[in-house]
A protein has these predicted regions:
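Short acidic, hydrophobic short linear motifs in intrinsically disordered regions
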Residues: 1-9
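Short, amphipathic alpha-helical interaction segments positioned at domain boundaries
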Residues: 38-86
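Short amphipathic alpha-helical interaction segments
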Residues: 10-26
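Ferredoxin-like iron-sulfur electron-transfer modules
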Residues: 48, 201-207, 227-232
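Long, Pro/Ser/Thr-rich low-complexity/intrinsically disordered regulatory tracts in eukaryotic proteins
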Residues: 72-179, 201-204
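A short, conserved structural fragment
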Residues: 25-39
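Local cysteine-cluster metal-coordination motifs and their immediate loop/turn environment
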Residues: 137-145, 209-223
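Compact structured core domains
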Residues: 174-203, 214-216
């Protein structure tokens, strides 16, 4: 929180720290939320968090409207960080993902070892859970491939759906826009029609997600990882 930052940095006042953290948030390096998953934020105050780079800051930096085009090396860094740190470790990840990265699971059963595509009706569970806090942004992986001149040429478009506090964060930092439940379902249906694979985030336990991706093999870093390292 700003109060905690001020305690550790007494040379700066709260207004300065708030402005500085907002700027860093807009860059995508840090994220903010109002959650109480750790039990330390019962009043749901705004808190900032330094994400892991992949999945995390890298994707957010890519969906920044101007930053990644202005600094194309961020696309190179994203691509390499979605590969190099994973070699030698990813091969040991069991089917189901073990709570790492992205995964495709049936929401109703939430069996970690399960590995199959998510039917569109299962995704409606998450959209109903977070209704009123749903957003959409361009696909970070497709944008990365476009900047790098690689991939299958899939149009980056608005394919990445954010939910909960992450959707609010994206709206407040100009990384995305709010959409309704019905609009989200339309995006998912279009993805189904194109043969894309639905993936949900898999790093916060079975009761929370922050995003739904509509992925294609020729552009998605997560699907590439599963193929290169044989981790379904």
């Amino acid at each position: 929180s700003i109060e905690q930052l001020a305690e550790k940095n007494p040379q700066f006042d709260g207004a300065y720290l708030e402005k500085a953290m907002q700027a860093v948030s807009e860059s995508g390096l840090v994220e903010f939320h109002w959650e109480n998953l750790d039990g330390k934020n019962p009043n749901h105050e705004k808190r900032w968090v330094l994400d892991m780079f992949v999945p995390g800051s890298a994707e957010i930096m890519m969906i920044n409207p101007e930053q990644s085009d202005m600094y194309p090396e961020t696309a190179d860094f994203f691509e390499r960080m979605a590969y190099l740190p994973l070699a030698g470790i990813t091969e040991m990840v069991p089917p189901g993902g073990a709570g790492i990265g992205m995964h495709v699971i049936p929401v109703e059963k939430a069996i970690p070892a399960e590995s199959k595509s998510l039917p569109i009706e299962h995704l409606s569970h998450w959209l109903k859970k977070y209704e009123g806090h749903i957003g959409v942004s361009v696909c970070s992986c497709r944008k990365q491939q476009r900047i790098r001149g690689e991939g299958s040429g899939d149009i980056e478009g608005e394919w990445c759906i954010g939910v909960g506090d992450f959707a609010d964060y994206c709206r407040e930092t100009n990384h995305g826009r709010d959409i309704t439940y019905e609009e989200a379902m339309e995006i998912l249906q279009k993805a189904e029609d194109k043969g894309y694979v639905h993936q949900i985030t898999n790093i916060d336990g079975e009761n929370k997600i922050f995003g739904i991706c509509n992925c294609a093999v020729g552009v998605c870093n997560a699907l590439r990882t599963s193929q290169l390292f044989n981790t379904p």
